[in-house]
Amino acid sequence: MKLVKESRDAMCRSGSQMIKCVRSFTNNNFLDLYYKEISKSNTPATHPVVTAVCSSILGIEKEKAAMMLLYGFTVSTIGAALRLGLVDHIQSQQILHKLKPNITSTIEKFMSIPLENMWQFSPQYDLVQMTHEQKFSKMFIT
């Protein structure tokens, strides 16, 4: 199953920027090979995969890499709500603080699941994204 095009593109732009950044201060043959394959369009630069590869190369434990990814996603989502005026700065920090245990428990629950048992299933989110793709005016670049 593929993500909605707009989400896929945004995820790949983010991953591309991350790998360019890490390559700027790290010399690693595997990272260079991976970057070349991305550049030739042989593989996408999806942000979660690039995060995993870069984290491994930088010696970051997979649990900490997962924490970075989920925490970053959470901050990004709360930041969007803040920009839309749905919450204020204090509320956004309160929400983030309340979600920390959920982030930790999610990582603990799913960290050891084999790759073949992972998939995406969020039909309501997909429908919202598909509708968003067709809109003329957008508040955020995705």
Name each region found by the language model.
Residues M1-L58:
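Internal, conserved structured core segments that host functional sites
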Residues K2, E6-D9, R13-S16, T46-V49, ...:
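Conserved active-site and cofactor/substrate-binding residues in soluble primary-metabolism enzymes
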Residues K2, Y35-I38, L58-E61, A65, ...:
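Generic preference for well-ordered secondary structure
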Residues K2-K5, K20, K36, K40, ...:
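Context-gated lysine
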Residues N28-Y34, K62-A65, H89-S92:
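Short, surface-exposed acidic
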Residues T43-G85:
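A contiguous pocket-lining binding segment that forms or flanks enzyme active sites
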Residues G72-T142:
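C-terminal auxiliary extensions adjacent to catalytic cores
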